[in-house]
Regions:
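Conserved short alpha-helical segments that host acidic/polar catalytic motifs at enzyme active sites
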Residues: 1-158
């Protein structure tokens, strides 16, 4: 045990609703692009739902994503990283990115630069997040399974 040590884990099981079922499309996805700047912010994100305008966002922002990555989720960390490079704070960059989406989404994201902050978003209808609080940890899921068993207090947002 190390006093003050923290561990952040972000995982997600998702059947591909956009993109093929493949390891490169597995969540969480990271913010890396083919030609990322050396000082680009590193983020990861997991998505439940669909970013309906992901192809338009890729083109408009000229995202340079590796060819085998076809999931719509990849635009989340890539766009947040781009916004951070322009001087936005992490919460501002995340809000701006989510606001640009068409579709219904539930998102969890984290940044290497601010590991103490977990970013959560809901947009559209049909998605939800269950947030559970327990001693020294919190658990977030799109369904209550696992959350209610592991936490003393939980709430579902829709």
């Amino acid at each position: 045990s190390q006093p003050g040590a923290r561990v952040g884990v972000l995982g997600h099981t998702r059947w591909a609703s956009v993109g093929i079922i493949s390891e490169p499309n597995a969540h969480p996805v990271n913010s890396e692009e083919l030609e990322s700047a050396a000082d680009a912010a590193y983020l990861v994100a997991a998505l439940n739902g669909d970013v309906d305008n992901h192809a338009d966002l890729r083109a408009r922002h000229e995202l340079r994503l590796a060819q085998p990555i076809t999931t719509d989720a990849k635009v989340i960390p890539a766009l947040v990283s781009r916004s951070l490079a322009k001087g936005a704070t992490l919460p501002e960059a995340f809000r701006e990115t989510v606001a640009s989406f068409d579709g219904s989404v539930a998102i969890a994201a984290a940044s290497a630069e601010q590991p103490e902050m977990l970013l959560l978003a809901l947009k559209g209808s049909g998605q939800g997040l269950c947030v559970g609080l327990a001693d020294n940890r919190f658990i977030v899921a799109s369904e209550p399974y696992g959350v209610v068993e592991e936490t003393q207090h939980h709430s579902r947002t829709q």
